[in-house]
Protein backbone atom coordinates (compact mmCIF):
# COMPACT_ATOMS: atom_id res chain seq x y z
CA UNK A 1 0.00 0.00 0.00
CA UNK A 2 1.40 3.37 -1.02
CA UNK A 3 1.50 6.08 1.64
CA UNK A 4 1.00 9.64 0.46
CA UNK A 5 2.46 12.53 2.46
CA UNK A 6 0.02 15.02 3.95
CA UNK A 7 0.28 18.37 2.15
CA UNK A 8 -1.67 21.53 2.85
CA UNK A 9 -0.06 23.38 -0.05
CA UNK A 10 0.82 22.44 -3.63
CA UNK A 11 4.34 21.20 -4.39
CA UNK A 12 5.30 24.27 -6.37
CA UNK A 13 4.87 27.49 -4.41
CA UNK A 14 6.52 30.69 -5.52
CA UNK A 15 5.42 33.34 -3.04
CA UNK A 16 7.81 36.29 -2.82
CA UNK A 17 8.40 36.54 0.93
CA UNK A 18 11.46 38.71 0.47
CA UNK A 19 9.33 41.37 -1.18
CA UNK A 20 7.79 42.00 2.27
CA UNK A 21 11.14 42.26 4.04
CA UNK A 22 10.99 45.99 4.75
CA UNK A 23 7.33 45.81 5.73
CA UNK A 24 7.98 42.96 8.18
CA UNK A 25 10.99 44.75 9.70
CA UNK A 26 8.94 47.93 10.20
CA UNK A 27 6.01 45.97 11.63
CA UNK A 28 8.27 44.11 14.07
CA UNK A 29 10.04 47.28 15.22
CA UNK A 30 6.68 48.99 15.85
CA UNK A 31 5.36 45.99 17.83
CA UNK A 32 8.58 45.81 19.85
CA UNK A 33 8.43 49.53 20.68
CA UNK A 34 4.78 49.23 21.71
CA UNK A 35 5.71 46.28 23.95
CA UNK A 36 8.56 48.23 25.57
CA UNK A 37 6.38 51.28 26.18
CA UNK A 38 3.50 49.21 27.55
CA UNK A 39 5.78 47.28 29.91
CA UNK A 40 7.37 50.55 31.07
CA UNK A 41 3.99 52.11 31.87
CA UNK A 42 1.88 49.19 33.11
CA UNK A 43 4.60 46.77 34.33
CA UNK A 44 3.85 43.08 34.91
CA UNK A 45 1.22 41.34 36.97
CA UNK A 46 3.69 39.47 39.18
CA UNK A 47 2.38 36.25 40.66
CA UNK A 48 3.09 34.86 44.11
CA UNK A 49 6.40 33.35 42.96
CA UNK A 50 7.84 36.83 42.38
CA UNK A 51 5.73 39.23 44.46
CA UNK A 52 5.71 37.19 47.65
CA UNK A 53 2.68 36.12 49.66
CA UNK A 54 1.28 33.67 52.18
CA UNK A 55 1.85 29.90 52.25
CA UNK A 56 -0.57 27.73 54.24
CA UNK A 57 0.29 24.06 54.73
CA UNK A 58 -2.70 21.79 55.34
CA UNK A 59 -3.16 18.06 55.92
CA UNK A 60 -6.50 16.50 54.98
CA UNK A 61 -8.06 13.19 55.97
CA UNK A 62 -8.29 12.17 52.29
CA UNK A 63 -7.00 13.23 48.87
CA UNK A 64 -8.68 16.53 47.91
CA UNK A 65 -10.43 17.47 44.67
CA UNK A 66 -7.88 20.11 43.58
CA UNK A 67 -9.68 21.41 40.45
CA UNK A 68 -12.86 22.01 42.45
CA UNK A 69 -10.87 23.66 45.27
CA UNK A 70 -9.13 25.98 42.80
CA UNK A 71 -12.50 26.97 41.40
CA UNK A 72 -13.96 27.74 44.84
CA UNK A 73 -10.95 29.70 46.12
CA UNK A 74 -10.57 31.51 42.80
CA UNK A 75 -13.99 33.12 43.35
CA UNK A 76 -13.06 34.68 46.71
CA UNK A 77 -11.70 37.85 45.09
CA UNK A 78 -8.32 37.75 46.83
CA UNK A 79 -6.22 37.40 43.68
CA UNK A 80 -4.21 34.41 42.50
CA UNK A 81 -4.52 31.32 44.72
CA UNK A 82 -2.15 28.42 43.96
CA UNK A 83 -2.88 24.92 45.30
CA UNK A 84 -0.30 22.14 45.10
CA UNK A 85 0.26 18.75 46.67
CA UNK A 86 3.55 18.21 48.47
CA UNK A 87 4.77 15.07 50.19
CA UNK A 88 1.70 12.83 50.13
CA UNK A 89 -1.52 13.41 48.19
CA UNK A 90 -3.21 14.45 51.46
CA UNK A 91 -0.72 17.27 52.09
CA UNK A 92 -1.72 20.56 50.49
CA UNK A 93 0.07 23.87 50.01
CA UNK A 94 -2.11 26.97 49.54
CA UNK A 95 -0.38 30.13 48.31
CA UNK A 96 -1.87 33.54 47.73
CA UNK A 97 -0.67 37.14 47.51
CA UNK A 98 -0.86 39.55 50.43
CA UNK A 99 -2.15 42.93 49.28
CA UNK A 100 -1.78 44.53 52.73
CA UNK A 101 -1.18 43.58 56.36
CA UNK A 102 -4.73 44.60 57.26
CA UNK A 103 -6.19 42.05 54.84
CA UNK A 104 -3.71 39.32 55.75
CA UNK A 105 -5.59 37.65 58.61
CA UNK A 106 -8.93 38.39 56.96
CA UNK A 107 -7.92 36.51 53.79
CA UNK A 108 -6.52 33.57 55.76
CA UNK A 109 -9.78 33.22 57.69
CA UNK A 110 -11.76 33.64 54.46
CA UNK A 111 -9.89 30.73 52.86
CA UNK A 112 -10.38 28.54 55.92
CA UNK A 113 -14.10 29.31 56.11
CA UNK A 114 -14.56 28.68 52.38
CA UNK A 115 -12.82 25.31 52.53
CA UNK A 116 -14.77 24.27 55.61
CA UNK A 117 -18.16 25.19 54.14
CA UNK A 118 -17.61 23.76 50.64
CA UNK A 119 -15.76 20.49 51.33
CA UNK A 120 -16.45 17.54 53.66
CA UNK A 121 -12.79 17.02 54.57
CA UNK A 122 -11.14 17.38 57.97
CA UNK A 123 -8.51 20.14 57.74
CA UNK A 124 -5.39 20.22 59.93
CA UNK A 125 -3.63 23.57 59.44
CA UNK A 126 0.04 22.88 60.13
CA UNK A 127 1.86 26.07 59.20
CA UNK A 128 1.30 29.60 57.91
CA UNK A 129 4.38 31.35 56.44
CA UNK A 130 5.00 34.71 54.80
CA UNK A 131 7.22 34.61 51.68
CA UNK A 132 8.80 38.02 51.14
CA UNK A 133 9.53 39.74 47.82
CA UNK A 134 13.26 39.14 48.33
CA UNK A 135 12.73 35.52 47.32
CA UNK A 136 10.84 36.80 44.27
CA UNK A 137 13.78 38.96 43.22
CA UNK A 138 16.08 35.96 43.43
CA UNK A 139 13.70 33.96 41.23
CA UNK A 140 13.54 36.79 38.68
CA UNK A 141 17.35 36.88 38.53
CA UNK A 142 17.47 33.08 38.14
CA UNK A 143 14.89 33.24 35.32
CA UNK A 144 16.81 36.01 33.54
CA UNK A 145 20.03 33.97 33.79
CA UNK A 146 18.24 30.92 32.37
CA UNK A 147 17.15 32.95 29.32
CA UNK A 148 20.63 34.45 28.91
CA UNK A 149 22.34 31.06 29.00
CA UNK A 150 19.80 29.65 26.55
CA UNK A 151 20.58 32.51 24.14
CA UNK A 152 24.33 31.86 24.45
CA UNK A 153 23.96 28.09 24.00
CA UNK A 154 21.82 28.60 20.89
CA UNK A 155 24.34 31.09 19.45
CA UNK A 156 27.19 28.60 19.91
CA UNK A 157 25.15 25.75 18.39
CA UNK A 158 24.17 27.77 15.30
CA UNK A 159 27.72 29.11 14.93
CA UNK A 160 29.15 25.57 14.95
CA UNK A 161 26.47 24.16 12.65
CA UNK A 162 26.24 27.06 10.18
CA UNK A 163 28.16 30.35 10.46
CA UNK A 164 28.23 33.31 12.86
CA UNK A 165 25.78 35.46 10.88
CA UNK A 166 23.21 32.65 10.95
CA UNK A 167 23.48 32.73 14.74
CA UNK A 168 23.05 36.49 14.71
CA UNK A 169 19.91 36.16 12.58
CA UNK A 170 18.38 33.69 15.03
CA UNK A 171 19.41 35.82 18.02
CA UNK A 172 17.62 38.86 16.58
CA UNK A 173 14.50 36.75 15.96
CA UNK A 174 14.61 35.35 19.51
CA UNK A 175 14.97 38.78 21.10
CA UNK A 176 11.98 39.87 18.98
CA UNK A 177 9.91 36.88 20.16
CA UNK A 178 10.77 37.38 23.84
CA UNK A 179 9.97 41.13 23.71
CA UNK A 180 6.59 40.46 22.07
CA UNK A 181 5.83 37.67 24.56
CA UNK A 182 6.62 39.93 27.52
CA UNK A 183 4.57 42.74 25.99
CA UNK A 184 1.66 40.35 25.47
CA UNK A 185 1.90 39.29 29.13
CA UNK A 186 1.81 42.90 30.29
CA UNK A 187 -1.13 43.80 28.03
CA UNK A 188 -3.26 40.78 28.96
CA UNK A 189 -2.33 40.92 32.67
CA UNK A 190 -1.26 37.27 32.68
CA UNK A 191 0.36 36.24 35.94
CA UNK A 192 4.14 36.55 35.72
CA UNK A 193 5.33 33.46 37.60
CA UNK A 194 7.71 30.53 37.24
CA UNK A 195 5.46 28.82 34.69
CA UNK A 196 5.66 31.86 32.40
CA UNK A 197 9.48 31.71 32.56
CA UNK A 198 9.13 28.11 31.38
CA UNK A 199 6.76 29.32 28.64
CA UNK A 200 9.31 31.89 27.40
CA UNK A 201 12.01 29.17 27.25
CA UNK A 202 9.56 26.95 25.34
CA UNK A 203 8.93 29.77 22.86
CA UNK A 204 12.69 30.20 22.39
CA UNK A 205 13.10 26.49 21.65
CA UNK A 206 10.20 26.43 19.18
CA UNK A 207 11.41 29.52 17.33
CA UNK A 208 14.95 28.12 17.02
CA UNK A 209 13.64 24.82 15.68
CA UNK A 210 11.59 26.62 13.02
CA UNK A 211 14.51 28.81 11.96
CA UNK A 212 16.99 25.91 11.82
CA UNK A 213 14.71 24.00 9.42
CA UNK A 214 14.71 26.98 7.03
CA UNK A 215 18.47 27.55 7.50
CA UNK A 216 19.16 23.90 6.66
CA UNK A 217 17.22 24.26 3.42
CA UNK A 218 19.03 27.51 2.61
CA UNK A 219 22.40 25.76 3.02
CA UNK A 220 21.23 22.84 0.88
CA UNK A 221 20.02 25.18 -1.87
CA UNK A 222 23.29 27.11 -1.80
CA UNK A 223 24.95 23.85 -2.87
CA UNK A 224 22.38 23.12 -5.59
CA UNK A 225 21.83 26.50 -7.24
CA UNK A 226 25.13 28.23 -7.89
CA UNK A 227 23.71 30.89 -10.20
CA UNK A 228 20.89 32.10 -7.94
CA UNK A 229 21.47 35.09 -5.68
CA UNK A 230 20.89 34.90 -1.92
CA UNK A 231 17.46 36.57 -2.13
CA UNK A 232 16.20 33.95 -4.59
CA UNK A 233 17.63 31.13 -2.49
CA UNK A 234 16.01 32.38 0.73
CA UNK A 235 12.66 32.75 -1.06
CA UNK A 236 12.95 29.26 -2.52
CA UNK A 237 13.92 27.75 0.84
CA UNK A 238 11.02 29.35 2.72
CA UNK A 239 8.55 28.18 0.05
CA UNK A 240 9.93 24.62 0.12
CA UNK A 241 9.58 24.37 3.92
CA UNK A 242 6.26 26.26 4.14
CA UNK A 243 4.04 23.16 4.12
CA UNK A 244 6.06 21.63 6.97
CA UNK A 245 5.97 24.92 8.90
CA UNK A 246 2.17 25.25 8.60
CA UNK A 247 1.54 21.61 9.58
CA UNK A 248 3.81 21.94 12.61
CA UNK A 249 2.26 25.19 13.82
CA UNK A 250 -1.32 23.90 13.39
CA UNK A 251 -0.70 20.66 15.32
CA UNK A 252 1.19 22.49 18.07
CA UNK A 253 -1.49 25.17 18.40
CA UNK A 254 -4.24 22.53 18.59
CA UNK A 255 -2.39 20.68 21.36
CA UNK A 256 -1.86 23.97 23.18
CA UNK A 257 -5.50 24.95 22.73
CA UNK A 258 -6.47 21.77 24.59
CA UNK A 259 -4.25 22.89 27.49
CA UNK A 260 -5.90 26.33 27.51
CA UNK A 261 -9.43 24.88 27.51
CA UNK A 262 -8.97 21.88 29.80
CA UNK A 263 -5.67 22.39 31.64
CA UNK A 264 -7.15 24.48 34.42
CA UNK A 265 -6.12 27.73 36.03
CA UNK A 266 -2.79 26.36 37.31
CA UNK A 267 -1.21 26.31 33.83
CA UNK A 268 -3.35 28.96 32.15
CA UNK A 269 -0.59 31.60 31.96
CA UNK A 270 1.83 29.04 30.54
CA UNK A 271 -0.62 27.75 27.91
CA UNK A 272 -1.83 31.17 26.71
CA UNK A 273 1.71 32.55 26.47
CA UNK A 274 3.01 29.52 24.55
CA UNK A 275 0.04 29.79 22.15
CA UNK A 276 0.95 33.40 21.40
CA UNK A 277 4.67 32.59 21.25
CA UNK A 278 4.20 29.84 18.67
CA UNK A 279 2.53 32.34 16.33
CA UNK A 280 5.24 34.95 16.98
CA UNK A 281 8.01 32.37 16.52
CA UNK A 282 6.59 31.14 13.21
CA UNK A 283 6.33 34.72 11.96
CA UNK A 284 9.89 35.59 13.02
CA UNK A 285 11.43 32.47 11.46
CA UNK A 286 9.90 33.35 8.07
CA UNK A 287 10.00 37.14 8.06
CA UNK A 288 13.00 37.98 10.29
CA UNK A 289 15.66 35.30 10.83
CA UNK A 290 15.73 34.18 7.17
CA UNK A 291 15.48 37.55 5.35
CA UNK A 292 18.05 39.15 7.68
CA UNK A 293 20.72 36.89 6.15
CA UNK A 294 20.77 39.15 3.09
CA UNK A 295 22.57 41.73 5.24
CA UNK A 296 25.47 39.35 5.92
CA UNK A 297 25.61 36.69 3.23
CA UNK A 298 26.84 37.04 -0.33
CA UNK A 299 28.39 34.60 -2.72
CA UNK A 300 32.03 35.12 -1.71
CA UNK A 301 31.23 34.14 1.89
CA UNK A 302 29.05 31.13 1.11
CA UNK A 303 31.85 28.59 0.67
CA UNK A 304 32.24 27.92 4.41
CA UNK A 305 28.49 27.55 4.84
CA UNK A 306 28.21 25.13 1.91
CA UNK A 307 31.06 22.93 3.16
CA UNK A 308 29.51 22.41 6.64
Curated annotation (Swiss-Prot):
It comes from the Bacteria. GO terms for cellular component: plasma membrane. The chain crosses the membrane at residues 28-48, 140-160, 164-184, 194-214, 246-266, 272-292. GO terms for molecular function: protein-transporting ATPase activity. Keywords: Cell inner membrane, Cell membrane, Membrane, Protein transport, Translocation, Transmembrane, Transmembrane helix, Transport. InterPro entries: SecD/SecF_arch_bac, SecD/SecF_bac, SecD/SecF_CS, SecD_SecF_C, SecD_SecF_C_bact, SecF_bac, SSD. It is found in: Cell inner membrane. It is a multi-pass membrane protein. Pfam families: Sec_GG, SecD_SecF_C. GO terms for biological process: intracellular protein transmembrane transport; protein targeting; protein transport by the Sec complex. Belongs to the SecD/SecF family. SecF subfamily. Forms a complex with SecD. Part of the essential Sec protein translocation apparatus which comprises SecA, SecYEG and auxiliary proteins SecDF-YajC and YidC. Part of the Sec protein translocase complex. Interacts with the SecYEG preprotein conducting channel. SecDF uses the proton motive force (PMF) to complete protein translocation after the ATP-dependent function of SecA. This is Protein translocase subunit SecF.
Amino acid sequence: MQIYPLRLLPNKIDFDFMNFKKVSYTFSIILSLISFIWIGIYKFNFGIDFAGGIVIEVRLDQAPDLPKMRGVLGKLGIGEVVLQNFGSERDLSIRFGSSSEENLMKNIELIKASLQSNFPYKFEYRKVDFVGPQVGRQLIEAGAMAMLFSFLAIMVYIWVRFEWYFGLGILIALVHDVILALGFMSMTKLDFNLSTIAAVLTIIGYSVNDSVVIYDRIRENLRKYHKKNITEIINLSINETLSRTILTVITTLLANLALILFGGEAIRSFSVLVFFGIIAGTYSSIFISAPILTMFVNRKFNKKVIER
